[in-house]
Amino acid sequence: MNQSERRNYLIQKLLEEQPQYAKMQIPGRCEEQKTLLRALMNVRMPGELSEEFLQIQDAYLAEENAGRGIVTLAEIQELSTDLYLWKGDITRLQVGAIVNAANSGMTGCYQPCHNCIDNCIHTYAGIELRNYCNDIMQRQGYAEPTGQAKITPAFNLPCDYVIHTVGPIVQGRLTEEQERLLCSCYEACLRIAEENNVESIAFCCISTGVFMFPNEIAAELAVLLSLIHISEP
């Protein structure tokens, strides 16, 4: 199968799962097909898929991710010893772990083609990530609390792991408790990375998107907590 054939296969199988989409026509243009495939992956509820589907999906995503360009740690600007700064798509990073700013459901973003980090990570990791996260949450039996962290395989991403954390939601004036919870996110991520022998971790700026944490304060806390961790023996 070439990439076009894989994409059409995946779209067709996902459409067949949803009776309401049975009469939907697959568009002819490549970019429109990619948008449709991403949307179908985004809205799909957790659930098993055939081994054939997963093999074709994994081959498709491997080529897509390689085509988007993989970025190694050696290519990133080092600000100080063991502290690096990079601006770009976190799903391209070939590091030990990337951090996902998740929601309390922990199974990804279900809004079709939404440009949040949660959606991007699940899109390029593949459907296995949602299923894996769902298994964790089914065993847990309650929504993920703010300020904690969970680690999963990265599946089709170039990193080894994804660390998921739920940041505080700011509505109105920033409070000390919200700052404490954001600090807890970073500390929990660093702790679980260490427990799993992760040698490099890429943080997004947690809670600064739709969760409305002030950007500058969030960035200062991220750098401070990273430096504290680096300085510890």
Regions found by a protein language model. Give the residues of each.
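Non-catalytic accessory regions outside enzyme or core folds
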Residues: 1-76
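Long amphipathic N-terminal alpha/beta scaffold segment
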Residues: 59-104
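Residue-level signal for alpha-helix termini/capping positions
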Residues: 91, 194-195, 227
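Glycine-enriched loop-and-adjacent helix/strand subsegments that border the catalytic/binding cleft
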Residues: 95-98, 102-196
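Short, solvent-exposed loop/turn segments at secondary-structure junctions
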Residues: 171-173, 209-212
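Charged helix-capping and loop-helix junction motifs
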Residues: 181-186, 215-223
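Short, glycine-/small-residue-enriched flexible loop/hinge segments at domain edges that mediate gating
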Residues: 195-210
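Residue-level detector of conserved catalytic or cofactor/ligand-binding positions
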Residues: 226-233
